[in-house]
Structures are given as C-alpha cells and as structure tokens.
C-alpha cells in the first residue's frame, strides 16, 4: 500500500476527533524502531477511524508508525515482560508478523481491544447489515400492527345491513325509502300551493302516511275523482236535507201569516 506521507501526517496532527488514545508499550512492530532491551518502547497511540498512529510522546509532531486496521484481528497475547497486559494485531496476509502491544492495566487493555476490533470497514459493514435487518423487521412489525388495528377499527365501524323488508298495504303499495312522515309532509307542503282547500283537508297527515290515492275511511278509493264523488254524495244529501228543512220552515211561516 502506498500512502502520501505528508497527507497522512497532516491528518494525524489535525484537529479531527480521535476515537481513542493513550500510552501503549510496543515490541518491534511495523515501522517501530527496535529497542535494545526486551521491555519494549512506550509510545503515545492515537486511533482515528481505521488508522492507528504512534508518536514519540503526547506532544510529538511527527508520527513514528501507522497501522491500517483492515484484514486483521485483535487477540490477547503474552507479553515478553511479566505483568504486562498485552494484545496483538494479527494480519491475514502471509509473511506479516503480528503487532504486539501492551496496555498499562486490564481496563485499558479491554478498552483498546474493543475499539481496535471495531475500527475496520469490515466491521462497519456487518453493523450496517445488522441495522438494516433490524429496520426491515421493525417496518414489517409496524405494518402488521397497522393492518391489525385497521381491521379492528373496520370491524367496530362496520355498518349494519339495511332492512329491505317493507310493510305492504292493502292495495299492494308500500312505503319507499323517502316515505317517512317528515318526507311525506315536506312533499305535501311543496305541492299544497297548487291544491284546493278541500283537497288539502282531505289529504291530512293520516292520509299522507297511507300513500297517494288512499283514504283512511274508504281504502278502496284509488283516485281523487272517486274520492271527490264519494264525499260529494254525503254533501249532496246534507244539502237536500237542508233545503227540505228550509222549505218546511218557509211554508210554516206563510201559513202563520195568512188571516
């Protein structure tokens, strides 16, 4: 792998936030100068993304080494010196020796192993796939919940089947859906302007509820002319009786006036 040393050094010293940093002891890793003794070299390490930089000190202005954390695993290891909490960065490529490091304590060792194991793009791809799977499961679960909630709401709000049975009348007619008392009265009111007074009196609320052409007294009448004749006979009889009475009273008065 070829890197631009100036660009890499600028990135290592830039103000970009670091994922982890601290002192580690190293034993002759890639890019690290060997030490005369077996105690290793204590350096300041900075992790940015998948790049692990090492410096001579915390105030160092030039990185000593760079480890690209791709195609590798982080494992616990034995340090050459006792009482050291060591771990190794092992690469899959043949001929590349492990990079042996040691932390100052068990907590620091655990923290470094954790962050270095999660620094590669391969790990990020696994996390993204897992998150996508969880998101898909959550969407499917939400869709099922919405579907079940809509079904429950629809079952509660399901309209009842209308009763199509209508009560039949004697002449075979029945009330339509608009033949309610209010609708019939409104319909009669809209037509009352063209009707005569006698016709309006005959078509009262009781007759309107029965339907057109029907009478509460004589259901066999089927039209206005028949109804008019039927009531007219009674009126003619009453008129004849009244005329007879009037003629009788007039004749009595004439007899009383005679000497």
UniProtKB/Swiss-Prot annotation:
One of its GO terms (cellular component) is cytosol. It comes from the Eukaryota. A motif (F&H) lies at residues 223-235. Keywords: Coiled coil, Cytoplasmic vesicle, Endosome, Golgi apparatus. Residues 17-121 form the PH domain. One of its GO terms (molecular function) is protein homodimerization activity. Changing residue 224 to A: Loss of OCRL-binding. GO terms for biological process: endosome organization; receptor recycling; retrograde transport, endosome to Golgi. Gene3D superfamilies: Pleckstrin-homology domain (PH domain)/Phosphotyrosine-binding domain (PTB) (2.30.29.30). It is found in: Early endosome; Recycling endosome; Golgi apparatus, trans-Golgi network; Cytoplasmic vesicle, Clathrin-coated vesicle. Residues 124-149 form a coiled coil. Plays a role in endocytic trafficking. Required for receptor recycling from endosomes, both to the trans-Golgi network and the plasma membrane. The F&H motif, an approximately 12-13 amino-acid sequence centered around Phe and His residues, is essential for binding to OCRL and INPP5B. PANTHER family: SESQUIPEDALIAN (PTHR22902), SESQUIPEDALIAN-2 (PTHR22902:SF15). Forms homodimers and heterodimers with PHETA1. Interacts with OCRL and INPP5B. Belongs to the sesquipedalian family. Was named after 'sesquipedalian', an unnecessarily long description of a simple thing. This is Sesquipedalian-2. It comes from Homo sapiens (Human).
